[in-house]
Amino acid sequence: MKLEFTEKNYNSFVLQNLNKQRKRKEYWDMALTVDHHVFFAHRNVLAAVSPLVKSLISSNDMKTTDELYITIDPNYLSPATVDQLLDYFYSGKVVISEQNVEELLRGAQYFNTPRLRIHCNDFLIKSIRRVNCLRYLFLAELFELKEVSDLAYSGIRDNFHFWASPEGSMHFMRCPPVIFGRLLRDENLHVLNEDQALSALISWVYFRKEEREKYFKKFFNYINLNAVSNKTLMFASNKLVGLENNSAHATLIESVLMDRKQERPCSLLSYQRKGALLDSVVILGGQKAHGKFNDGVFAYIIQENLWLKLSEMPYRAAALSATAAGRYIYISGGTTEQISGLKTAWRYDMDDNSWTKLPDLPIGLVFHTMVTCGGTVYSVGGSIAPRRYVSNIYRYDERKEAWCLAGKMSIPMDGTAVITKGDRNLYIVTGRCLVKGYISRVGVVDCFDTCTGEVVQCITFPIEFNHRPLLSFHQDNILRVHSHRQSVEINLQKIKANKSTTSVPLLPNSCPLDVSHAICSIGDSKVFVCGGVTTASDVQTKDYTINPNAYLLDQKIGEWQTLACPPEALDCPACCLAKLPCKILQRI
């Protein structure tokens, strides 16, 4: 009789004991020295995982009694990394982070271990973000990681307007010539306009003038001077004085300026590259007259006072929410004829004009508020049914591809007004909830820390309005809450609320702002509003219609301006500020 017995996890058991022997310096026959640190190991283990070690043993015709010594340059691999590599060789486990991924890639290259290289490659792909894509591109080029290189390049191209801005330029000025030239040559480069591309080129050259001046002539040809404003052309002309062999470039600039003097003034928009960005307000979904739900996606191009239809949503809904993050618009929730609180979530790619289905929200929501903070998408509060409010704040985790509970507000509310401060804090200001059996807007400010998942500051204040307020920051610690009946300035440092004499004028149709309107702050103290319900001129009839107009409020002077008429009158659409690529004008 014969019976076969197999030990469970025997391979792991053997390697664990070998690793213990290594750490106790038992039975070792090789040593790795890094900056006076000596690490002992077993030749047979390292030869099994590293072709480098196997090659050293075979090429030197080592006997079983010989000991192998390897000295590693500490400028290439640190002692801590070598220790981590040895743990990986013996256990097959490794913890990779943004801090150690570069040295682990060096270790994988040094010991010729392709599986570790694959792990590092996968980590870079899963963790790439706007703030690290420039560094990741450097790593990808250095270690020949094509997929990472393509993703990182796309991240830089799609966020060039950030990298070329004062906020991101400090790091971007170190961009290698081969990458910088490739970016300027890209027709889909996401610049604010061609002025930014030319200014970035000049700043990049002057950052290291002696070594980069030779690239200026080649890179200058990638700029469309006809799309650059006179002011920036004059600025560039003055900067050319400090560069050698600049006469040809100066002549080109002078030629463009002279042609403009002789021709009628025209918009520079038609000359911009396809990827140049247009500040736009995007309207999604909503309910039409007679109760029909809408799936249209419309964009109001602020600069041109022009409406365009971009796409159609994968579903029809009103009281949904939306937010933009880079080239994407995220939408979720809403109500339809059959369902009062949808869980569905989608992502719209403005560049490719395509939709991607996202995992459902944990619960169905209406009148929730979606917002982007630090490049991450959040959903704040909302209703799961009539008069049933939630305090949940959800975060969409791109790595896990799931909605996660980020934290909770101090009280359950829907219809909240939210403003971000930096890349960390959400200020959730007022919202609707049940007060003594009635739906009422409450005066509360929650400062939600997205890193800790906690409300780190909660301020309550009396309010005399039940409509939706407008928010803005004055200086660093003053939060302004503007409304028709009352405005409040909240000192976040002193935790004190003071009434303000300024107020928001009623809409030109004499209606107050409420949750049925699409409301969007567009910078420079200006607020965009469209849609929503309005009462009939004869108040005796108590009849309601949908507002067919769009308005722009200049808060500095307290006046409304009527804009181009939207394609459709919509009640409770979603609304967000987005940067659309110029190529959509060619696509329409």
Curated annotation (Swiss-Prot):
Pfam families: BACK, BTB, Kelch_1, Kelch_6. Keywords: Cytoplasm, Cytoskeleton, Developmental protein, Differentiation, Kelch repeat, Phosphoprotein, Repeat, Spermatogenesis. The modification Phosphoserine is found at residue 149. Expressed in testis and in spermatozoa. GO terms for biological process: cell differentiation; spermatogenesis. SMART domains: BACK, BTB, Kelch. GO terms for cellular component: cytoskeletal calyx; cytoskeleton. Gene3D superfamilies: 1.25.40.420, Kelch-type beta propeller, Potassium Channel Kv1.1, Chain A. Interacts with CYLC1; the interaction may be relevant for proper acrosome attachment to the nuclear envelope. This is Calicin. It comes from Mus musculus. The gene is Ccin.
